[in-house]
């Protein structure tokens, strides 16, 4: 009962971010429905990840596919003679996506579900990270919303030169054909799931007005997982 009394007020206090997270998931995942509908009228088959979708697919996609078919330690499988050697890339990212595919019975389903699930989780993490820094819900929501859709624009802030201003305007008003930033995997759609909790836990742990142990554990666990 005490846990319930402590959790419910916090949920109500931050309820808006949960509603917005659902909207983020719909926006990030909606393109799958539009593409399927378009292909359906033309008799095509839909694959959510192709080499044409993004250059990263040539490396990351085949690693997730290898895990899906049972090779849990997916090394540099794009080069046959290196496939059995230690991986120079993190192993946990393809394990997460490939394992989700095995759970759902299809890697395509895993890729589609990840667009509905992972960006909202990242959005919530961004919100609580910003709230920890500002203690203002409105500012935290603004930052999380801004970052989840146009994170690269942050690199041009403040626009103190004409070049930075031009770059900022380009990134705020992207091309309609560009993919959303957190659709890409492994980076940043999966890697942010580990870096955000690590940073949030670190901020909580170093606050002078708290002696929480869970924040130290959170920072330590996810900081360690970032290397895998």
Residue ranges and their predicted role:
Residues 214-228:
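Membrane-interface alpha helices of multi-pass inner-membrane proteins
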Residues 18-28:
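Hydrophobic membrane-insertion alpha-helices, especially the h-region
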Residues 1-10, 207-218:
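Membrane-interfacial, low-structure loops and terminal tails that flank and connect transmembrane helices
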Residues 28-197, 227-228:
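Active-site lumenal/periplasmic loops and adjacent helix-entry segments of GT-C-fold
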Residues 190-215:
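Membrane-interface transmembrane helices that cradle and orient dolichyl/undecaprenyl
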């Amino acid at each position: 009962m005490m846990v319930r009394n402590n959790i419910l007020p916090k949920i109500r206090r931050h309820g808006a971010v949960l509603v917005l997270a659902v909207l983020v998931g719909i926006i990030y995942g909606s393109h799958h429905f539009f593409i399927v509908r378009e292909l359906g009228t033309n008799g095509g088959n839909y694959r959510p990840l192709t080499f044409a979708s993004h250059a990263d697919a040539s490396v990351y996609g085949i690693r997730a596919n290898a895990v899906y078919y049972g090779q849990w330690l997916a090394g540099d499988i794009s080069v046959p003679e290196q496939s059995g050697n230690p991986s120079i890339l993190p192993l946990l990212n393809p394990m997460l996506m490939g394992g989700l595919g095995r759970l759902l019975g299809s890697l395509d389903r895993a890729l589609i579900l990840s667009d509905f699930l992972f960006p909202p989780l990242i959005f919530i993490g961004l919100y609580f990270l910003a709230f920890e820094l500002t203690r203002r819900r409105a500012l935290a929501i603004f930052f999380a919303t801004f970052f989840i859709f146009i994170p690269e624009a942050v690199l041009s802030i403040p626009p103190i030169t004409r070049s930075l201003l031009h770059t900022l305007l380009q990134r705020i008003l992207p091309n309609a054909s560009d993919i959303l930033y957190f659709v890409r995997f492994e980076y940043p759609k999966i890697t942010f799931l580990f870096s955000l909790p690590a940073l949030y836990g670190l901020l909580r742990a170093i606050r002078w007005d708290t002696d929480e142990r869970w924040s130290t554990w959170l920072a330590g666990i996810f900081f360690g997982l970032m290397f895998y």
